[in-house]
Amino acid sequence: DVLGSRGLGDVYKRQVHKDMYSFVRGYEFIGVDSFRKAQPREHAYAAITAFHLYGWYRDNHFCGRCGKPLKHDDKQRMLRCACCKNMVFPKICPAVIVAVTDKDRILLTKYAGRTYRNYALIAGFTEIGETTEETVSREVMEEVGVKVKNITYYKSQPWGLSGSQLLGYFCELDGDDTITLEEDELSVGTWVKADDIDVIDDHISLTREMIEKFRSEHVSHN
């Protein structure tokens, strides 16, 4: 949990135990996922980035090469080992979000075993030696068992909750539309027509932005 004001405008950037600050009036503990809906949007991003940095600092007290303590660099956002000169930069994991489309349909999924229950898009991390376009094809095949073509980059988004840089892609179904779920990852995978997609007011999620972009461009206007 992160300690923040009731208005979410003031964020304390260290993760703490609830009992330590239970006496502070005017504050309450909230889960970091609360920042998905926080406004203004730039404050929400600042809080999520603070959480990302906290995790990096927490996990990097000592040099992974020689074991000596790391120190903050004076000029860069970097940790430096004075002994062996090793430089440690914030961990940022590239990942893709994929909107698979078939004319007026889009492939929507739901995660298995997670608290987030809304529809989402296929997503996954890029492997070493892999282009992000290759990640798109691999993740789609692994999670829902279909092939894709015409992979097109949309936009990116930093996402500190998972320490990621998210890269959004649109692509088209290539062949058979039969879905074979990877049940360890997903509980639902289904084709949904643009007319059947609900408009959700979500100002921070790249996933929701991509779903809404597809819906608005393909919904019938009869």
Where do the model's predicted regions map?
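Single conserved hydrophobic/aromatic residue that forms the stacking wall/gate
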Residues: 1-12
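NUDIX/MutT-family hydrolases
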Residues: 20-39, 181-208
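Short Cys/His-rich Zn2+-coordinating modules
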Residues: 40-50, 61-68
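Short, flexible, mixed-charge glycine/proline-rich loop motifs
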Residues: 50-59, 70-75
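N-terminal strand-loop-strand
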Residues: 61, 75-121, 125, 147-148, ...
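Short functional micro-motifs and their immediate structural scaffolds
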Residues: 68-71, 89
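Hydrophobic alpha-helical positions that pack around
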Residues: 122, 136, 140
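Active-site-adjacent beta-strand/loop module that shapes the phosphate/pyrophosphate-binding cleft
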Residues: 157-179
